[in-house]
Amino acid sequence: MPQLYIYIRLLGAYLFIISRVQGQNLDSMLHGTGMKSDSDQKKSENGVTLAPEDTLPFLKCYCSGHCPDDAINNTCITNGHCFAIIEEDDQGETTLASGCMKYEGSDFQCKDSPKAQLRRTIECCRTNLCNQYLQPTLPPVVIGPFFDGSIRWLVLLISMAVCIIAMIIFSSCFCYKHYCKSISSRRRYNRDLEQDEAFIPVGESLKDLIDQSQSSGSGSGLPLLVQRTIAKQIQMVRQVGKGRYGEVWMGKWRGEKVAVKVFFTTEEASWFRETEIYQTVLMRHENILGFIAADIKGTGSWTQLYLITDYHENGSLYDFLKCATLDTRALLKLAYSAACGLCHLHTEIYGTQGKPAIAHRDLKSKNILIKKNGSCCIADLGLAVKFNSDTNEVDVPLNTRVGTKRYMAPEVLDESLNKNHFQPYIMADIYSFGLIIWEMARRCITGGIVEEYQLPYYNMVPSDPSYEDMREVVCVKRLRPIVSNRWNSDECLRAVLKLMSECWAHNPASRLTALRIKKTLAKMVESQDVKI
């Protein structure tokens, strides 16, 4: 009977302990007392060692907001830590609380990190009522990287928007100002044009104006005011060519066709030089391209350099030979007229209104034009050199352009040409003229045979040869364009072959003069009864 009583007592104690353990809620970590039964606070009689927390001393802590049910006078008992905590809720209000913390997990809870969205701070201690004096403070507000980046992006976007708006306003003002200036210039131009129409009488042709200037003027071309008037009244029709200097247009002045050479602004030196040469006294010749006017047109934002000349619809000798063949009479007419033009350039005319000797320096088939009557005229004088015999001075143009490498004389290619004397420039022109005669002779039909058109040295150098390519062929190997065997069987071509060979001789002193070439061709023209 006593044993049964003991078993009942033990069973009751066990059930009491179980009920105490299961009755703890989730917040017992913070406000649980951690109290144990008397039997739990002692070692078992069998000598079994209890857990470490069973040996820790119990603390009395101050509690407020986290008091357990058995708290007395705002105090609680625990074997863990006393704590004080301050929290901020979703509305931004702060709450300060304190209480007891159980031993289990207390180290982790005391090192608790606040959440990113809700701030809180917890402080722990291990002496009686120590948390009564703890005053935890909330951590400072930290701006997250995303929020910080958003601010930067917002500032950047606003700055960009302001800059774009400012640029739009500036561009609009600039365009409006330019538009007003353009309208003003156009009105002024139209007003000047009306005045100019009255300046040149209606019915006057270009030939009439030029004849008048030749008979009553200085022989250097139309007066500048007339030139500017003509340039203003030109109507551009279509582009007919383009080169390294600019473009060539076919235009009309009072119904008459004219050629308008529009120079790039970078080629102002070439425009100035060519204008200067054309306006040289006594320069006009039937085998030199007829000069009409020169002018600079434009406003502050654009500039056009005009050179207005006679228009020849057959184009250049280069274009003509590619699509047409020649008989001996046509060949001699082309060669003789070109020689006449070159002779006029090279010849100095003495007198009070004399003409200086001029060397072309860029003679080639593309710079010789074909007139309606089948004769030639020499064009493109942008590189021309003048010689003043009174001062013995060689006037070389100050521009960056150079001649065409394919047509350069040996002394130009190997840089042995004496630039301080005028005669070497003349002899270099003669070499180039010999190559042009070769181009013509290839297209002359004899015995029903004719060669296709080719440029000089077509089979010896690339299509765009370098100085080294030409120097190797012309100076080192001393080669010249190939000649067909049929030329020797025709009297006319045989004479032309002899002439061109004397033109392209390696030694400049051995070459013919332009006057000698002209006289030789004149005899051939006369023997063939060619009408010039």
Curated annotation (Swiss-Prot):
<feature type="glycosylation site" description="N-linked (GlcNAc...) asparagine">
    <location>
        <position position="73"/>
    </location>
</feature>
<dbReference type="GO" id="GO:0060045">
    <property type="term" value="P:positive regulation of cardiac muscle cell proliferation"/>
</dbReference>
<keyword id="KW-0547">Nucleotide-binding</keyword>
<dbReference type="Pfam" id="PF08515">
    <property type="entry name" value="TGF_beta_GS"/>
</dbReference>
<dbReference type="GO" id="GO:0003151">
    <property type="term" value="P:outflow tract morphogenesis"/>
</dbReference>
<comment type="function">
    <text>On ligand binding, forms a receptor complex consisting of two type II and two type I transmembrane serine/threonine kinases. Type II receptors phosphorylate and activate type I receptors which autophosphorylate, then bind and activate SMAD transcriptional regulators. Receptor for BMP2, BMP4, GDF5 and GDF6. Positively regulates chondrocyte differentiation through GDF5 interaction. Mediates induction of adipogenesis by GDF6. May promote the expression of HAMP, potentially via its interaction with BMP2.</text>
</comment>
<dbReference type="GO" id="GO:0051148">
    <property type="term" value="P:negative regulation of muscle cell differentiation"/>
</dbReference>
<feature type="disulfide bond">
    <location>
        <begin position="61"/>
        <end position="82"/>
    </location>
</feature>
<dbReference type="GO" id="GO:0001880">
    <property type="term" value="P:Mullerian duct regression"/>
</dbReference>
<dbReference type="GO" id="GO:0071363">
    <property type="term" value="P:cellular response to growth factor stimulus"/>
</dbReference>
<keyword id="KW-0325">Glycoprotein</keyword>
<dbReference type="GO" id="GO:1990712">
    <property type="term" value="C:HFE-transferrin receptor complex"/>
</dbReference>
<dbReference type="GO" id="GO:0046332">
    <property type="term" value="F:SMAD binding"/>
</dbReference>
<dbReference type="InterPro" id="IPR045860">
    <property type="entry name" value="Snake_toxin-like_sf"/>
</dbReference>
<feature type="disulfide bond">
    <location>
        <begin position="110"/>
        <end position="124"/>
    </location>
</feature>
<dbReference type="GO" id="GO:0005886">
    <property type="term" value="C:plasma membrane"/>
</dbReference>
<dbReference type="GO" id="GO:0009897">
    <property type="term" value="C:external side of plasma membrane"/>
</dbReference>
<dbReference type="GO" id="GO:0003215">
    <property type="term" value="P:cardiac right ventricle morphogenesis"/>
</dbReference>
<dbReference type="GO" id="GO:0001756">
    <property type="term" value="P:somitogenesis"/>
</dbReference>
<feature type="region of interest" description="Mediates specificity for BMP ligand">
    <location>
        <begin position="107"/>
        <end position="109"/>
    </location>
</feature>
<dbReference type="GO" id="GO:0001649">
    <property type="term" value="P:osteoblast differentiation"/>
</dbReference>
<dbReference type="GO" id="GO:0003222">
    <property type="term" value="P:ventricular trabecula myocardium morphogenesis"/>
</dbReference>
<keyword id="KW-0675">Receptor</keyword>
<dbReference type="GO" id="GO:1904707">
    <property type="term" value="P:positive regulation of vascular associated smooth muscle cell proliferation"/>
</dbReference>
<feature type="disulfide bond">
    <location>
        <begin position="63"/>
        <end position="67"/>
    </location>
</feature>
<dbReference type="GO" id="GO:0003161">
    <property type="term" value="P:cardiac conduction system development"/>
</dbReference>
<dbReference type="GO" id="GO:0060412">
    <property type="term" value="P:ventricular septum morphogenesis"/>
</dbReference>
<keyword id="KW-0812">Transmembrane</keyword>
<keyword id="KW-0479">Metal-binding</keyword>
<keyword id="KW-0067">ATP-binding</keyword>
<dbReference type="GO" id="GO:1900006">
    <property type="term" value="P:positive regulation of dendrite development"/>
</dbReference>
<dbReference type="GO" id="GO:0003148">
    <property type="term" value="P:outflow tract septum morphogenesis"/>
</dbReference>
<dbReference type="InterPro" id="IPR008271">
    <property type="entry name" value="Ser/Thr_kinase_AS"/>
</dbReference>
<dbReference type="InterPro" id="IPR003605">
    <property type="entry name" value="GS_dom"/>
</dbReference>
<dbReference type="InterPro" id="IPR000333">
    <property type="entry name" value="TGFB_receptor"/>
</dbReference>
<dbReference type="GO" id="GO:0043235">
    <property type="term" value="C:receptor complex"/>
</dbReference>
<dbReference type="GO" id="GO:0042803">
    <property type="term" value="F:protein homodimerization activity"/>
</dbReference>
<feature type="binding site">
    <location>
        <position position="261"/>
    </location>
    <ligand>
        <name>ATP</name>
    </ligand>
</feature>
<dbReference type="GO" id="GO:0045944">
    <property type="term" value="P:positive regulation of transcription by RNA polymerase II"/>
</dbReference>
<feature type="domain" description="GS">
    <location>
        <begin position="204"/>
        <end position="233"/>
    </location>
</feature>
<feature type="disulfide bond">
    <location>
        <begin position="76"/>
        <end position="100"/>
    </location>
</feature>
<feature type="active site" description="Proton acceptor">
    <location>
        <position position="362"/>
    </location>
</feature>
